[in-house]
Amino acid sequence: MAGISEPYIEIFEQPRQRGMRFRYKCEGRSAGSIPGEHSTDNNKTFPSIQILNYFGKVKIRTTLVTKNEPYKPHPHDLVGKDCRDGYYEAEFGPERRVLSFQNLGIQCVKKKDLKESISLRISKKINPFNVPEEQLHNIDEYDLNVVRLCFQAFLPDEHGNYTLALPPLISNPIYDNRAPNTAELRICRVNKNCGSVKGGDEIFILCDKVQKDDIEVRFVLDNWEAKGSFSQADVHRQVAIVFRTPPFLRDITEPITVKMQLRRPSDQEVSEPMDFRYLPDEKDPYGNKAKRQRSTLAWQKLIQDCGSAVTERPKAAPIPTVNPEGKLIKKEPNMFSPTLMLPGLGTLTSSSQMYPPCSQMPHQPAQLGPGKQDTLPSCWQQLFSSSPSASSLLSMHPHNSFTAEVPQPGAQGSSSLPAFHDNPLNWPDEKDSSFYRNFGSTNGMGAAMVSAADMQSASSNSIVHATHQASATAASIVNMETNDMNCTSLNFEKYTQVLNVSNHRQQLHQAPAACPPVAAPGSTPFSSQPNLADTAVYNSFLDQEVISDSRLSTNPLQNHQNSLTLTDNQFYDTDGVHTDELYQSFQLDTNILQSYNH
């Protein structure tokens, strides 16, 4: 009839090409169902067809044929519902427009059974494309890992017999997932999905079975394509590949994502792609720049913290004053640079606040009882018998060899000096002791001067006789209170009994005898008293550039007041800041020295 189209078969949904495994009959299990092309785990579909330009009953036959032309009947069998002798056949009514095949499975045969299977197809006249029988027996031409579905439709004739055959239609090839050369390519897992833009990163891929001579790793982005580098030895048991990434086509400043997939060159089959990120070239692979930045930030924060602490630091406390009992109130905190600093004390207006006047007592040669006899120690006898200079006192007697024993004050009119310390003289530590042992002048210039340990070695019990209470005691010759070498305080409180000064630029003059000492029997008198105030020793204290001539008193002794009185007994020096205050702390009573000459 003119204008009426002939009926034909159309595939509504193709079978899935990969992912299905062909089963052997001896496995004793179902071969499964061939899924449709769009089948998912949640929505399973199956291969389906429809017959266009026809409405009525139809008989459908589905067989397996080879992949390549001529399409010969395949030795594998279709198994499932409505299947017999290796093929599927069923009748459908006009109510079904789309015909779906849900229970079709593929069952493979052994190589030794290929001839028998082909003979069965010929006997059942299963040859949709009428391939000559001679070609059908050529067993070596069959590919056992791939098949196609062939759909045939038969329409009923006027007698109701299905004799009118429509042209057969074949599906896409279906590959056995068990065969590596036809299996579905799938990346199961990778150890890393990013790498350097320069390439060369080692990547491990776990995959389904592949053939080591028919596989490659491809990187794709738009029109750019590159392949990973590996050899056949890098394919482990067909399920793992170790390769190195190719470099990207250009340098990048930000990460860029490309597609990575497996591809089989023989059939150009590819796997599902996965993302791979190329990272910019790292100029500092070990993170040294970041570490330096962190260190810089840490230092800046530390400096800021220290700066705030310095600005908030309280001012230095005033120099501790000496109370009438002669004890220091408070130590000066160490907050200065490591240079010798000797700030001055100016709290006492006159030396009378520190020392009571030493009045001259008449000589009373009283008999000493046998129970109270003070003699010079053996060390002093040895010292003054040879008349050594004051600078040799330290080497003969260490600074801790004597104790400052303070005699109790006598009757009214006694000139004994008040005791400043009740305990033996102790240096704060060995550092301060060594400093005063080696310190020779106020500014590091001038002649060598007597050390503090020499002055400390004098004992009040050995100098002053028991009957002469007017003799000055040396309970505390030098006091030091320091936290560090930065701030040092010297106290020449009771060293005045061994000094007789008339002029700080001239040699010491020996004072006339006024109060001769009375020694007990067996004691050694002071035969050479000027040795206690050696000229070189005293000049070393006074002959310095830091002493201001205009501030030091050089007036001669008048009205028999043979004493040189300065306003304070402590001095400090901070690199010339208080040099005009230096050595204003000596109170010298020549009557004491005169008493030793008698």
Swiss-Prot record:
Location(s) in or outside the cell: Nucleus
RHD domain residues: 7-296
Pfam families on file: RHD_dimer (PF16179), RHD_DNA_bind (PF00554)
Region (Disordered): 391-426
Gene Ontology MF annotations: DNA binding; DNA-binding transcription factor activity; DNA-binding transcription factor activity, RNA polymerase II-specific; RNA polymerase II cis-regulatory region sequence-specific DNA binding
Modification type Phosphoserine: residues: 266
GO biological process: one example: inflammatory response
Main location: nucleus
Keyword DNA-binding recorded: yes
Listed InterPro entries: Ig-like_fold, Ig_E-set, IPT_dom, IPT_NFkappaB, NFkB/Dor, p53-like_TF_DNA-bd_sf, RHD-n_c-Rel, RHD_CS
Protein purpose: Proto-oncogene that may play a role in differentiation and lymphopoiesis. NF-kappa-B is a pleiotropic transcription factor which is present in almost all cell types and is involved in many biological processed such as inflammation, immunity, differentiation, cell growth, tumorigenesis and apoptosis. NF-kappa-B is a homo- or heterodimeric complex formed by the Rel-like domain-containing proteins RELA/p65, RELB, NFKB1/p105, NFKB1/p50, REL and NFKB2/p52.
Name listed for the protein in its UniProt record: Proto-oncogene c-Rel
Source species: Gallus gallus
